[in-house]
Amino acid sequence: MKLLENSSFEAINSQLTVETGDAHIIGRIESYSCKMAGDDKHMFKQFCQEGQPHVLEALSPPQTSGLSPSRLSKSQGGEDESPLSDKCSRKTLFYLIATLNESFRPDYDFSTARSHEFSREPSLRWVVNAVNCSLFSAVREDFKALKPQLWNAVDEEICLAECDIYSYNPDLDSDPFGEDGSLWSFNYFFYNKRLKRIVFFSCRSISGSTYTPSEAGNALDLELGAEEADEESGGGGGEGRAEETSTMEEDRVPVICM
């Protein structure tokens, strides 16, 4: 899996980390190519030792609704209903696991993840609604401006109408967002088989009482700031640094989500 550059996602991600007072929202959207090379090919061969690439694996029912995709199609009376709607091939499962590994490395390893920790979502509409409700409940009106920008960027990158959508719903022991203070989280994969690409949308809400800046990936910024402060401590740089930080805080704009 290779992370693909996307300037629109980078701009949106800068707005997906926001403090709401009671909680902190930390989110990101990333695009990955499913074309395997090097380590991916080696890992895929090992993965396929447990079953051939096209063998179907059972998935868990989706959490965005009370119906699985297969039951939904049956309830709607569709002639093309498929009893395999709640399954995916081992190759697709590998793509999902490899995306998690690439996105969360080096902090987490998902190589032992199993198919029951994933779900296939019933429809794009339900997923969009679930994401919008989570983000709107967290940041309210601030999300309205970001909402169309976010989904337009995702659609341009992955062509949502062609996607199968999966979610990662692990148990507490495996959940990278299962730490103390976690209020909610979601991990969605928008998989376009034709483009051989996955857009991964991950977001979580952390209680303000347990949140630390490093959880949002700011540890390096803090270290660099400390080094600069040490270098300037002899010439009044500390005071200038404090003024600069104050200005940055005043200019910071709350993140907007849809």
From Swiss-Prot:
Cross-link (Glycyl lysine isopeptide (Lys-Gly) (interchain with G-Cter in SUMO1 and SUMO2)) at residue(s): K35
Similarity field: Belongs to the MAF1 family.
Protein name as annotated: Repressor of RNA polymerase III transcription MAF1 homolog
Compositionally biased residues, Basic and acidic residues: 240-253
Modified residues (Phosphothreonine): T64, T212
Cellular location(s): Nucleus; Cytoplasm
Organism: Mus musculus
Superkingdom in the source lineage: Eukaryota
Sequence positions bearing Phosphoserine: S60, S65, S68, S70, S75, S214
Region described as Disordered: spans on this chain: 58-85, 226-253
Pfam families reported for this sequence: Maf1
Keywords, alphabetical: Cytoplasm, Isopeptide bond, Nucleus, Phosphoprotein, Repressor, Transcription, Transcription regulation, Ubl conjugation
Annotated Gene Ontology cellular component terms: axon; cytosol; dendrite; inhibitory synapse; nucleoplasm; nucleus; perinuclear region of cytoplasm; plasma membrane
Quaternary state and interactors: Interacts with TFIIIB subunits BRF1 and BRF2. Interacts with Pol III subunit POLR3F. Interacts with TFIIIC subunit GTF3C1.
Modification comment: Phosphorylated at Ser-60, Ser-68 and Ser-75; the major sites of phosphorylation. Nuclear accumulation correlates with a concomitant dephosphorylation. Phosphorylation may attenuate its RNA polymerase III-repressive function. Sumoylated with SUMO1 and SUMO2, mainly on Lys-35. Desumoylated by SENP1. SUMOylation promotes the ability of MAF1 to repress transcription and suppress colony formation.
Disrupted gene: phenotype observed: MAF1 deficient mice display a decreased metabolic efficiency. Constitutive high levels of Pol III transcription reprogram central metabolic pathways and waste metabolic energy through a futile RNA cycle. MAF1 down-regulation also alters the expression of genes involved in lipid and sugar metabolism.
Role this protein plays: Plays a role in the repression of RNA polymerase III-mediated transcription in response to changing nutritional, environmental and cellular stress conditions to balance the production of highly abundant tRNAs, 5S rRNA, and other small non-coding RNAs with cell growth and maintenance. Also plays a key role in cell fate determination by promoting mesorderm induction and adipocyte differentiation. Mechanistically, associates with the RNA polymerase III clamp and thereby impairs its recruitment to the complex made of the promoter DNA, TBP and the initiation factor TFIIIB.
InterPro entries listed in its UniProt record: Maf1 (IPR015257), Maf1_sf (IPR038564)
Polar residues composition bias: residue spans: 61-76
One annotated GO biological process: negative regulation of transcription by RNA polymerase III
One MF term in the entry's GO annotations: GABA receptor binding
